[in-house]
A protein has these predicted regions:
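TM-adjacent membrane-interface loops and short helices in multi-pass inner/ER membrane proteins
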Residues: 158, 277-319, 326-329, 333-340
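Short beta-alpha connecting loops at secondary-structure transitions
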Residues: 154, 264-269, 313-315, 367-374, ...
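Transmembrane signal-anchor hairpin modules in multi-pass inner-membrane enzymes, especially those
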Residues: 1-70, 74-84, 92-118, 176-191, ...
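Alpha-helical transmembrane segments of multi-pass inner-membrane proteins
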Residues: 1-19, 30-43, 66-73, 84-98, ...
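Soluble non-cytosolic domains of exported or imported proteins
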Residues: 274-277, 298, 321, 470, ...
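A short secondary-structure junction motif
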Residues: 135, 221, 307-311, 504, ...
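Flexible juxtamembrane loops connecting transmembrane helices in multi-pass membrane enzymes
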Residues: 143, 147-155, 213-217, 249-288, ...
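C-terminal luminal/periplasmic domains and tails of membrane-associated envelope-modifying transferases
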Residues: 461-630
Length: 630
């Protein structure tokens, strides 16, 4: 059964690496189901064959962090948002636990490494397709990649996340190249892939990934040279000199090859114009509302709107993520979440460093062999962890399944790097082992049931959006109906269906008792109930209430929207339209002019305050020109 669990595990990693590459769960569900099966089989097996003892301290910190994040997600104000973090967390826990336990045998770790290299090859192939000019290419038919042209993305929707994935796998490959067991042909292939990944990171033009790569490379070099100093001191100075020459020449070549590309990135998106500082201010403002436990899972979706900085350019889109995982952790999970995350990182990094020390002081003296896959993966995992943590200062890769699961794999390698013998006796915490198995079972059940209860609804919502883009109103309606039927608690499906129904009504059909209007109002009211923090839901419901002559209730929703989006043209303009419909022209004019002062403007080509204000002036002029009624 253990081998069956590991086969499902490898398939889950592969599917997630290809499909689980964006922040929504839509394409993660197949990989989630496979990982759930792997975890369930492992749980039923209960006593797994573990070749080496894992660190109970690492397991304890991971249990505390996972338990807290899962509990906070369960108690979050918007279940649909929390679901995204919860399922990625469950997948990460299964990956972590199976890496620590069932996959502790060297051959299974090599198999995991082979899956990662397969994903690297796939990402490089898709990256070449992007580089050839087909920037919107997506591996799933009928879906398009929405990222900016000029930056490769591989399987990922966001090029920065491809950079994160490459920088993690690159150091595992570098560790295997330097200290892993294998022939010359394998090492040559690894060297080629490492260079390809370095070029790939440069072609993503992700400055955060490049920074993480540089710092990770520095740590890798220091640790590798330290190992050589402890074990093969006669080679140290030769390797140091050769390493410096290769680093300088390699860096110069990479810079020259990608110079024009990186300069173009700086021209189109200069560092001086980076808006991250303003986004970070919004995250800190949300954190201040609930410092200890945060606002809840992914509540920065709406917090980025409510606490938007006035310094952001007026036409800048909504951030949705803090572009800094540590500030996002503070905003969503508070100080408790961040402190537990730091404990997890420290425990695993310490265990990895302890293994390197044990290997050089004990294992090497016993065997006389420096080549070791365990040493290779531990060294690579430490450098990859460092690169990942640096990159996380600028990005949100832990809100995407594939990089998160890769990070969980790195932590698993560090939690059980391969200690053996009696030279090092680790602290045993028996209750922790039981808790890890219970969490593994719960996470597995969640991953198996999630695609059925939520994945089908996500699928129908995506199909409805495709139908809308193709202007197929009937198909859109059918898909939205199916989405709501599959998951009645999906606020986005409710909102989209209510909005679609409102859009079908002609002016003469917007009467209080019209059945379509009633149905639209019910959907929008349910969407607001399920997610009272999304200002667009409140605005749509206000529009429906106005059509039903429920003007006071409409005004309440408009005031709610103004609290949720205080700087936005859309919410101010909706208030003006409300007064305009009621014939209160002075209030309407004041609201339109207030909308013109908004710090967050609607996109060009969409409904704008000035267009509606002109309609108001025309309306007033027509009224004045009309002869007075007797």
């Amino acid at each position: 059964m253990q081998s069956v669990a590991l086969v499902f595990f490898l398939l889950g990693l592969l599917f997630t690496g290809v499909l689980g590459t964006e922040t929504r769960l839509l394409f993660f569900w197949p990989g989630a189901a496979l990982l759930g099966l792997a975890g369930l089989v492992a749980t039923l097996r209960w006593r797994l064959r573990v070749l080496f003892p894992p660190s109970d301290i690492c397991l304890a910190t991971s249990v505390l962090f996972t338990g807290y994040v899962a509990s906070r997600a369960w108690l979050s104000p918007v279940a649909a948002y929390a679901r995204e973090d919860l399922f990625i967390l469950a997948g990460a826990w299964v990956v972590y636990m199976l890496t620590v336990t069932a996959a502790s045998h060297p051959r299974w770790r090599v198999a995991i490494f082979a899956v990662l290299l397969t994903l690297v090859l796939g990402n490089l192939v898709v990256g070449f397709i992007h580089l050839s000019g087909n920037w919107q290419f997506h591996v799933v038919p009928f879906f398009l990649r929405s990222a900016t042209e000029g930056r490769i993305g591989g399987f990922f929707a966001n090029p920065n996340h491809l950079g994160a994935f490459f920088s993690m796998v690159l150091f595992l490959a570098a560790g295997f190249l330097c200290f892993g067991r294998g022939g010359a042909a394998l090492k040559m292939c690894l060297g080629f892939l490492i260079i390809s990944m370095m070029i790939g990171v440069a072609l993503t033009a992700s400055r955060g990934a490049l920074t993480g790569l540089a710092i990770g490379a520095a740590l890798f070099s220091l640790l590798a040279l330290g190992i050589v100093w402890q074990t093969q001191r006669h080679l140290f100075w030769s390797l140091l000199g050769g390493g410096l020459v290769v680093s300088v020449l390699g860096g110069a070549v990479l810079w020259k090859v990608n110079e024009e590309y990186l300069r173009g990135r700086e021209i189109t998106s200069p560092m001086a114009n980076d808006v991250r500082l303003e986004i970070w201010q919004a995250a800190l403002a949300q954190h201040a509302q609930s410092p200890w436990v945060g606002a809840g899972s992914r509540m920065f979706y709406d917090g980025s709107v409510q606490y938007r900085s006035e310094k952001l350019p007026a036409y800048a889109g909504e951030a949705l993520f803090a572009h800094n995982e540590y500030l996002q952790m503070l905003a969503d999970y508070g100080w408790v979440g961040l402190v537990l995350l730091v404990l997890v990182i420290m425990a695993h990094a310490w265990n990895g460093l302890a293994f390197i020390g044990w290997f050089t002081r004990h294992r090497f003296l016993q065997t006389g062999r420096l080549m070791s896959n365990h040493l290779a993966f531990c060294l690579g995992a430490l450098a990859a962890l460092t690169a990942m943590l640096v990159h996380a200062i600028f990005e949100f890769q832990f809100h995407v399944a594939a990089p998160t699961l890769t990070a969980a794999l790195l932590l698993g390698l560090l939690a059980n790097p391969g200690f053996e013998g009696s030279e090092r006796r680790s602290l045993r915490l028996p209750p922790v082992r039981l808790m890890t198995k219970i969490l593994l079972g719960l996470a597995s059940v969640l991953l198996i049931t999630g695609p059925w209860f939520y994945g089908l609804s996500d699928y129908h919502v995506a199909k409805a959006q495709i139908a809308e883009a193709q202007k197929d109103a009937f198909e859109q309606s059918q898909e939205l109906n199916a989405a709501v039927d599959k998951d009645p608690m999906n606020p986005e499906a409710r909102y989209l269906r209510g909005l679609s129904l409102l859009g079908k009504l002609r002016a003469d059909q917007r009467t209080p008792n019209h059945p379509v209007l009633k149905r639209a109002t019910e959907d929008l009211a349910q969407a607001v109930k399920l997610n009272p923090h999304h200002y667009l839901y409140a605005l749509a419901l206000a529009d429906a209430y106005d059509a039903q002559s429920r003007h006071q209730e409409a005004l309440e929703q408009l005031h709610r929207a103004l609290i949720l989006a205080p700087l936005h043209e859309e919410s101010r303009m909706a208030l003006a339209v409300h007064w305009h419909r009621l014939g209160q022209f002075e209030k309407a004019e004041a609201a339109y002019l207030w909308a013109g002062e908004a710090k967050a403007m609607n996109e060009e080509g969409s409904s704008r305050w000035i267009d509606n204000y002109r309609l108001l002036l025309q309306h007033v002029a027509l009224i004045r020109q009309s002869p007075p009624s007797n």
